[in-house]
């Protein structure tokens, strides 16, 4: 937990401070701080589910489940804070886009937190450590690493108003999709040759599908970052258009 606290402190340095800030500016700064805290919690949750999978650490997996309640509480607080800003300040232009973007980012992060909790529950209910051959052939650890790297990079894009980095997410998610597609074949082959380890196969493929959904949420977040900075709505646009 100390590591997460230190990381949060480092990220708070990216949030601008000014002696001439208006009340709305102060509220937006606080809102960005809260969403950053939630972001780092979700990243930590995914790291822990990876570790609990590798080490078959049920206690760590239970810690992930317990922490999800804190993420849910923070999501509700951010929602309320956004509603208060709408009601009290009637923001316009870039301020309005910032609040709208954070509101949607908040939802995507909360869902990613739910996914981490769901993955942790597979480790909790599994009867045996996961077969290393299955872990290797499905590339689930590589998928974990890429998903977490994408989640960390969309945070950097948010903190630095970096639309180029945000746009790179659309291309990088292809690796996550590719692993997901290949894993279906790998798991089917594994179950056929290891009929006594069907549970392993079903749990691993379920984890991979959940990680693929985190990648989708990261793409949604990248769209909101671009909307916030450039006032461009990318929803329903083709991948080629999003990358332009």
Indicate residue ranges for each PLM-predicted region:
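Cytosolic, long alpha-helical scaffolding segments
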Residues: 2-244
């Amino acid at each position: 937990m100390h590591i997460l606290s230190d990381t949060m402190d480092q990220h708070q340095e990216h949030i601008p401070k000014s002696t001439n800030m208006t009340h709305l500016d102060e509220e937006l700064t606080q809102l960005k701080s809260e969403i950053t805290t939630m972001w780092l919690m979700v990243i930590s949750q995914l790291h822990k589910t990876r570790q609990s999978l590798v080490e078959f650490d049920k206690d760590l997996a239970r810690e992930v489940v317990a922490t999800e309640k804190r993420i849910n509480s923070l999501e509700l607080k951010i929602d309320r804070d956004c509603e208060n800003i709408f009601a009290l300040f009637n923001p316009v232009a870039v301020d309005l886009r910032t609040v709208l973007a954070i509101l949607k980012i908040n939802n995507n992060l909360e869902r990613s937190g739910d996914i981490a909790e769901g993955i942790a529950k597979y480790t909790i209910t599994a009867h045996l450590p996961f077969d290393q051959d299955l872990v290797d052939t499905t590339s689930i650890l590589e998928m974990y690493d890429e998903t977490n790297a994408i989640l960390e990079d969309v945070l950097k894009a948010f903190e630095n108003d970096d639309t180029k980095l945000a746009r790179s997410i659309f291309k990088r998610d292809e690796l996550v999709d590719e692993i997901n597609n290949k894993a279906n074949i790998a798991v089917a082959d594994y179950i056929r040759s290891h009929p006594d380890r069907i549970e392993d196969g079903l749990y691993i493929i379920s984890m991979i599908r959940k990680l693929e959904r985190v990648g989708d949420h990261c793409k949604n977040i990248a769209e909101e970052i671009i909307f916030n900075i450039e006032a461009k709505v990318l929803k329903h646009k083709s991948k080629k258009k999003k990358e332009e």
